Amino acid sequence: MRQACLRRPVVETLAMTYRSSALKRRVCPSSKTPDSRATLQSSITERILRELEHGVVPWVRPWGSGTATSVGIPRNGASGRAYSGINILLLWNAAAWNGFGGHNWLTFRQALELGGHVRRGENGTTAVYADTFVLEAEKLRAAQSGEEPHRIGFLKRFTLFHVDQCEGLPDTAFTKPMHLEEAMIAPRVKALLSASGADIRITGDQAYYAVNGDFIVVPPVQMFHDPNNWPRTALHELSHWSGAKHRLNRDLSGKFGSELYAREELVAELSAAFVCAELGIVPTVRHADYIGAWMGLLRKDERAIIKAASLASKAANFLMDFDRQGTPRPDPQDAEQTLASGALTPITPILVPAARAA
């Protein structure tokens, strides 16, 4: 039996950028849409589908354009809490469309509580959160049977404003993510990978996660034209690794070309983008050849992108815990020496040489 694995050729794909022609066709996010649950899900999916159809990948933020500052995850400007799931894509999308700098957002009330206000005429951006309810008939059934009632999940909308849309806010509302020098990125990723304890094998010319063997294969850094594509690729495969049954327990049984395979690839793609943004690495499209499959998936299931983004956030948080758990930060001088020496490999633990999975 062929060893089950999630694998792909290492193809250096160019990052999808926000082209001016695509921007002209994009629809600016707005909170003024009908308030049914079905409409909310479908409007989010339709927006992302339009992005993909126009060659714009929503999780590839144009970090180097216009007023964009540094790479980062959207956060609440009052609490500092990071937004998650589909809200990351919605807020990245709105920031790109409106040319906002930074990553901090507030509700209308939070802006007032901080001593400021939203400027007159500004339009908010729709964000969502999950809630549940119980049907009256289900409440009655549960009461009669003594069982817990079955709760139905749904999305509820709320409106956020970027701090650039506000006036009179304290400086704390404009906090920016710590900028990570490029020389620090590779050592930090290396430390995260090492802390994860993943079995990472540096060999061959393909990158994949072998499900049955629970190991990752990544080619040597020298095989990448852009050295930053090595950590991007490693984090993508580590995202697959996070879904193993004894970790986050996602269904990794999909065969290449199947819908289940496309779903998992979308989760890993989003998870890697979220982790890259947290680590100061500009996300890129690692799987441009899967975009067609993702569009088909979203057309078939309007909940697919929301579910994938939710699973991706869980995976990203799982991986970022290895970065947060006291992982030492390398000295900048040491980091430069690490890059200069090409010491992205080996990464421990390593088992080499490794046979290529069939």
Language model segments and positions:
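N-terminal accessory/interface modules of nucleic-acid-binding and processing proteins
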Residues: 2-358
